[in-house]
């Protein structure tokens, strides 16, 4: 605005915004939306003090007082300055239930009905055989954004459990897409390429976030002191001892931390796509309090990293999974993927192509969180396991009157396609049961190659801790899905202004800043001007999959007796 980034425009904030809209408690910037403020960090500290003392500089003590007033006032209103009025924990059941009611109502109001052929929704579940298919039908799907509220664990439920409790054996569940898999057996692991011994080398080393940014094998920390683990399956009393040295040094990516590290080779007896998963348990806030952890101690950019060299001839490892992210100021992402394991563990993994009988180099690490012992396992889902899960789901769909197929998307992503084998699963379920309803849990637009083959599509987004109840409310008609799309759903990514190949200055095609990217670091270039969102589609005459503002409902209405 006026040639300035808005969050740096003092005239706008203090003279216009605060003066005319009567903001008396300060303005909160969106988390990580202040990239240009960060770039000005060199003006703080001693340089700011020197500027205040220098009469030639336009900075005064009054300006400093103005800047810190709102921050200190907020702390004071919550009793944090004198520590006399802090809200005691844990939160009581009354407050929890009040919040739960609001969360359920909002999730239901946000539901968007994208398709409802033959008015298959709402459903009278009485007497119907229903097959619930997909991990999202059994587990609450949660987002992985940096400020995602994960809610109370004891409030989370699933559509399958709710239906089963009410309608009994008529309701069945099939995973369809097996993300958990099984712990990789020792006879598929080798400490070195030419070894006949089974297992992986485990050692303790110092690791930074950038250590394997390029997957360069030469920078993997080496040590002569190691043990060979037959399987990587540590939990409960078998958990690995806590690593406490180096864990209290502040949040710096460049500061090495102590990690447990595993290195060796993986060999499958099947050819095809395998899901390799680094699974670990998040200790929870109880450990945070028990071990007297301070915000300044939360120094883990990522708790675990899983790398594999997919092709024997390839020079670099590629990252298949990223663990829990923990940083300072209480920011914790306990889940790195939107669907956790059945037992609640984080499930960081990815799909890789393996050929039977070939050995693939694998490296992964994990550090301790909140100074607790490490519970971790290395698992996989082989092609035969994937096929069995899909066949079981198809068979369940054949035996049912209605198939509820839950799908998820790892938003925000560089692609619109559903992850893993979900598109294939939906296609096969829809072919087996003409009455297939797809329920989506995602945060952005997704491709729907199966759109014409299913009866209904219900967009439930990431609906929070009460999401299962809210989804049930919409499915059985207790709530009318009155939500409308807040964004345009394109047919393909290149339809979006940000991904238009004619304008490479807008987006880093590699997904990260590099010398090959046209976009400068921390910069978004809106060369389309005001033609953003739906205006871009109108201007370019692009037919979207679903337009901005789209949404059906259960209400029936008509116009009659019209006169001009």
Predicted regions: what they are:
Residues 65, 69, 97-104:
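An alpha-helix initiation/capping motif
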Residues 84-99:
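Flexible, acidic loop-helix segments that line cofactor/substrate-binding pockets
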Residues 41-45, 52-83, 91:
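Long, well-ordered, tryptophan-enriched scaffold segments
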Residues 1-21, 25, 43, 49-55, ...:
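C-terminal non-catalytic regions of proteins with extracellular/luminal or membrane-system context
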Residues 3, 27, 35, 59, ...:
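Short aromatic/hydrophobic-glycine micro-motifs
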Residues 26-44:
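Mobile "lid/hinge" segments at catalytic clefts and subdomain interfaces of large enzymes
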Residues 18-32, 69-77:
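Conserved short secondary-structure transition element at the edge of the structured enzyme core
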């Amino acid at each position: 605005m006026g040639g300035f980034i808005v969050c740096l425009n003092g005239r706008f904030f203090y003279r216009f915004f605060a003066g005319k809209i009567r903001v008396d408690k300060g303005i909160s910037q969106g988390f990580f939306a202040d990239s240009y403020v960060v770039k000005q960090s060199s003006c703080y500290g001693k340089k700011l003090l020197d500027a205040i003392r220098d009469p030639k500089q336009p900075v005064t003590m009054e300006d400093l007082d103005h800047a810190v007033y709102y921050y200190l006032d907020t702390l004071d209103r919550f009793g944090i300055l004198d520590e006399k009025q802090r809200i005691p924990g844990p939160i009581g059941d009354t407050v929890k239930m009040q919040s739960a009611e609001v969360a359920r109502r909002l999730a239901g109001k946000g539901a968007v009905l994208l398709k409802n052929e033959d008015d298959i929704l709402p459903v009278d579940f009485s007497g119907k055989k229903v097959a619930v298919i997909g991990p999202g039908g059994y587990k609450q799907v949660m987002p992985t954004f940096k400020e995602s509220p994960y809610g109370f664990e004891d409030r989370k439920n699933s559509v399958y459990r709710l239906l089963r409790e009410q309608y009994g054996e008529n309701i069945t569940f099939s995973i369809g897409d097996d993300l958990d898999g099984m712990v990789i057996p020792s006879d598929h692991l080798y400490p070195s390429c030419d070894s006949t011994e089974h297992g992986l080398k485990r050692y303790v080393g110092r690791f930074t976030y950038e250590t394997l940014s390029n997957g360069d094998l030469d920078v993997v920390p080496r040590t002569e002191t190691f043990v060979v683990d037959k399987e990587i399956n540590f939990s409960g009393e078998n958990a690995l001892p806590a690593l406490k040295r180096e864990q209290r040094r502040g949040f710096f990516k460049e500061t090495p931390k102590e990690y447990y590290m595993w290195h060796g080779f993986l060999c499958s007896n099947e050819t095809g796509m395998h899901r390799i998963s680094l699974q670990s348990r998040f200790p929870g806030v109880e450990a945070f309090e028990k071990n007297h952890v301070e915000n300044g101690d939360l120094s883990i950019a990522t708790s675990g990293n899983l790398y594999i060299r997919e092709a024997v001839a390839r020079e670099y490892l590629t990252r298949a999974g990223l663990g829990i992210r923990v940083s300072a100021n209480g920011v914790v992402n306990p889940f790195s993927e939107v669907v956790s394991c059945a037992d609640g563990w984080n499930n960081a993994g990815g799909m890789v192509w393996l050929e039977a009988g070939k050995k693939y180099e694998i490296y992964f690490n994990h550090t301790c969180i909140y100074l607790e012992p490490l519970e971790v396992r290395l698992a996989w889902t082989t092609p035969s396991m994937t096929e069995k899960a899909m066949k079981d789901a198809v068979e369940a769909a054949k035996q049912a009157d209605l198939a509820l197929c839950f799908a998820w998307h790892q938003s925000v992503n560089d692609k619109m396609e559903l992850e893993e084998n979900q598109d294939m699963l939906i296609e096969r379920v829809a072919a087996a049961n003409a009455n297939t309803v797809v329920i989506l849990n995602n945060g952005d637009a997704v491709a729907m190659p199966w759109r014409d083959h299913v009866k209904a599509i219900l967009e439930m987004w990431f609906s929070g801790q009460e999401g299962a109840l809210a989804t049930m409310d919409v499915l059985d008609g207790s709530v009318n899905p009155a939500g409308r799309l807040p964004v345009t759903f394109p047919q393909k990514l290149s339809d979006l202004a940000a991904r238009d190949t004619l304008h490479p200055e807008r987006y880093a095609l590699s997904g990260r800043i590099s010398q090959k990217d046209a976009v400068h670091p921390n910069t978004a270039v809106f060369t389309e001007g005001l033609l953003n969102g739906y205006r871009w589609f109108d201007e370019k005459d692009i037919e979207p999959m679903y337009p901005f503002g789209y949404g059906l409902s259960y209400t029936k209405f008509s116009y009659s007796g019209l006169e001009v």
